[in-house]
Amino acid sequence: MKLAKVGQDIETGNAAWTFDGKVADTFVSHVSQSVPLYEKGHDLVCQLSDYFVDKTSTVYEIGTSTGELIKKVAQHNAHREGARFIGIDPVGPMVEKAKEHCADTPSVTIIEDDARNFEFEKSDLIISYYTIQFIPPRDRQQLFDKLYEALNWGGALIMFEKVRAPDARFQDMAVSMYNEF
């Protein structure tokens, strides 16, 4: 299979995207350049967390990759002493980077696991930031059910995701804006 270069020495082919190997070393730079408003989305998640996180909260991020977002959310909520922030990712090199990145933020724990298999505690906030697209479609509903069951009453799932527009015209607009980015 011929692999295509997608930036920062990252290669992929049809149905062959992986986060293993050296991807963790350049992930933050790559995703910031390839996903429009990626960091702005982090800021929005932090602002939304104000409505759900208190000093007794458990907060999860599934697909935490290098831990950038879970660390930002934890630092944003540092005044809520006692809150716990848990990043989950199934890819060893990403987990290693996340643990290094979050080492100076004691309220953050990084766990290597697949969200589909993880035993969630009750939580007030679960974050899925461009993660569900990497879950096989046949497993998505079961994962959504699991995340819903893990939420306390009044809790939230904040999800950013690439989606197909319901109308071809809007899909064309979104693709055009993405390509211009």
Each language-model region and where it sits:
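Conserved alpha-helix/loop element of class I SAM-dependent methyltransferases that forms part
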Residues: L37-K55
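Class I SAM-dependent methyltransferase SAM/SAH-binding core
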Residues: Y60, T66-R116
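A conserved beta-strand element that flanks and buttresses the S-adenosyl-L-methionine
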Residues: I127
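Conserved class I S-adenosyl-L-methionine
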Residues: I158-F181
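N-terminal, positively charged/glycine-rich alpha-helical extensions of SAM-dependent methyltransferases
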Residues: M1-T26
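A short glycine-rich, Lys/Arg-flanked "PGG" loop and its adjoining helix->strand segment in the class I
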Residues: Q141-W153
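Short catalytic micro-motifs in class I SAM-dependent methyltransferases
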Residues: Y130-F134
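Short conserved loop adjoining the S-adenosyl-L-methionine
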Residues: N117-E121
